Amino acid sequence: YRGEPHRVAPIAVLQDIEYIDDSKGTNVGATVAAINSVGADRRIVLILGGDGKDQDFSSLRLPIQQYVRSLVLIGKDAAELRQVLQGAGVPMHDAASLEDAVKLCRSLAQTGDAVLLSPACASFDMFKNYVHRGEVFAQAVQTLAQDLGIELDHLGGVQT
């Protein structure tokens, strides 16, 4: 069984770091579920942010404390996320674009980690929709693979 696109979907493994697209994680509940699932057996570098639509982000704090190595914040509500999550004790970094976020995640992740795009926010501040956001993420992972000299047969394929 292959999962639905953009719903905790593995994109690639590059140098023992797995890149996972959960662009459909457009609200806090979905992102909490993704963090708990992916974090069950490894640490996460999490890309979070976008248009939060006035959600309460505080329920992200505990799973982030438990499973997340670093946060990379993007989009309109990055500052609000930073304010709510600053007590979580997890390093936070800002990225101007999703492409920059993927590059930054590569430098923050350690062997065996996952880089997870699960933004807990709508995409409309930077993208047409969550599908577009997921496609930009996948393309950024493809570009990273090329920069590392790694040939990916197809996205969704696992290469090391």
Residue ranges of each PLM-predicted region?
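Acidic, Mg2+-coordinating active-site environments of NTP-dependent enzymes
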Residues: 1-19, 82-85, 138, 148-153, ...
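Nucleotide phosphate-binding/pyrophosphate-handling subdomain across enzymes
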Residues: 1-67
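A short acidic, helix-capping loop that chelates divalent metal ions and anchors anionic groups
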Residues: 17-18, 123-127
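Glycine- and other small-residue-rich loops at beta-strand/loop junctions that grip anionic moieties
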Residues: 22-23, 49-50, 74, 93, ...
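C-terminal helical cap/extension that packs against the catalytic core
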Residues: 58-113, 152-160
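Short beta-strands and strand-loop turn motifs
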Residues: 116-120
